[in-house]
Design a protein with these regions (language model features):
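Hydrophobic/basic alpha-helical segments
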Residues: 1-206
């Protein structure tokens, strides 16, 4: 299928761009602005501002970040960490993981997985959007195997995964690998709301 221009997918073999320097710079600007008015805000209000001005930027088209080197993800994680510390008025020496869990904020890498898997769920369970349903398919072995009824996806062959640099970032590949790694009870969830809730709990436990 032709490459899509939506945020869900930019073509199955198109490598995603690195995190935008402008996005990181703008997000840090909003974090600094929030820190200046934080003494006058309740924690709930500060959290709402951070979600609206900072996390929304980190989440925009974040499915395209799947498969990027960890060093590039760290730039975005630094933004989220700074926002979390401002909201909770934590010190730089405080460990960030409990702070993020306290706010119910998944780390950036897990937010990317959450977005990719949510798109995969819609493709598998709701047969939409069409440009994604064409890229993944349920695993149907030729012989009767126990794995046949476990809602697994078929891993793309070497023709799709052409190179380590690009092919493994393709939605058809990375969504399949992430999906098959989920516990069976999450894969077999029927509603998107239940799936997202269970998925978030699972990702927090990793």
């Amino acid at each position: 299928p032709p490459p899509s221009t939506t945020c869900g997918h930019s073509g199955d073999h198109t490598p995603p761009p690195p995190p935008s320097t402008t996005c990181v710079r703008t997000s840090f600007f909003h974090v600094r602005s929030l820190s200046k008015i934080r003494p006058y805000l309740t924690r709930k209000a500060a959290c709402s501002v951070a979600v609206s001005l900072v996390l929304s930027r980190l989440d925009y088209c974040n499915s395209l970040l799947a498969g990027l080197p960890q060093m590039q993800i760290k730039r975005l994680q630094a933004v989220q960490n700074a926002a979390a510390r401002v909201v909770t008025r934590s010190r730089k020496t405080d460990h960030i993981t409990p702070i993020l869990k306290q706010l119910h904020w998944l780390p950036v890498a897990e937010r990317v997985k959450h977005k990719v898997l949510s798109l995969a769920f819609r493709a598998v369970r709701e047969n939409r959007p069409a440009y994604l349903t064409d890229l993944i398919r349920l695993y149907c072995p030729s012989r009767s195997l126990r794995s046949a009824d476990q809602s697994l996806l078929a891993v793309p062959g070497p023709r799709v995964v052409k190179t380590k640099r690009y092919g493994q970032r393709a939605f058809s590949y990375i969504a399949t690998i992430l999906w098959n790694a989920l516990p069976r009870n999450i894969r077999e969830t029927n509603s998107i709301s239940s799936f997202r809730s269970s998925l978030k709990t699972f990702l927090f436990s990793q």
